[in-house]
A protein has these predicted regions:
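AMP-binding/adenylate-forming catalytic core of the ANL superfamily
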Residues: 76, 81-82, 105-172
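Gly/Ser/Thr-rich phosphate-binding loop
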Residues: 1-38, 51
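Short Gly/Pro-enriched turn/cap motifs at secondary-structure boundaries
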Residues: 41-46, 94-97
Length: 172
């Protein structure tokens, strides 16, 4: 974990950068002066001259509510012009207004710090309800004796998908 890296390697000024190859070198970053909690629980605030926002993945509407999940998108000098000789793929990820879709789900806090909470493609849709595997995994990790867990959608005739959890128990 980030705490272990900071403690064991005495890297007190470590920061986190979030971004994609398509938005190099990144979109957001924590700062060395940020609190420990901000460093380990968020991916920071936007780089200068880079616009970052959250949108509803279904409607494309902006999300400004603190703590509400949405797709993190950005535009700025860091965003690629497009995929080489692949305008169709480019059109899928870059809007006409220049915003690049990350495919990642995030929240924003009251201080403007973003936290990545999952991937859109990983989302399980059960009877019209959006379920985020990462939330379930984090809960299962709180159970004593769990070493690792992976949650995925399993096809279901009635609901479209149901939740499956694959758990590795700790030895002993």
């Amino acid at each position: 974990t980030m705490k272990e890296v900071i403690d064991k390697m005495n890297m007190t000024e470590i920061t986190s950068v979030y971004g994609l190859t398509e938005a190099s070198p990144g979109m957001t970053q924590t700062n060395a002066a940020d609190t420990f909690e901000k460093k380990v629980n968020t991916v920071g605030t936007p780089f200068p001259n880079v616009e970052v926002k959250l949108i509803d993945p279904d409607t494309g509407e902006d999300i400004t509510e603190v703590g509400k999940k949405g797709e993190i998108v950005c535009r700025g000098f860091n965003v690629m012009k497009g995929y080489y000789k692949n305008p169709e793929k480019t059109k899928e990820v870059i809007e006409d207004d220049g915003f690049l879709h990350s495919g990642d789900l995030a929240t924003i806090d009251e201080d403007g710090y973003y936290s990545i909470v999952g991937r859109i493609k990983d989302m399980i849709i059960r009877g019209g309800e959006n379920i985020y595997p990462r939330e379930i995994e984090e809960f299962i990790y709180t159970i004593d004796g769990v070493q690792d867990v992976q949650v995925a959608g399993i096809p279901d005739e009635k609901y479209g998908e149901i939740v499956g959890a694959f758990i590795i128990k700790e030895e002993g």
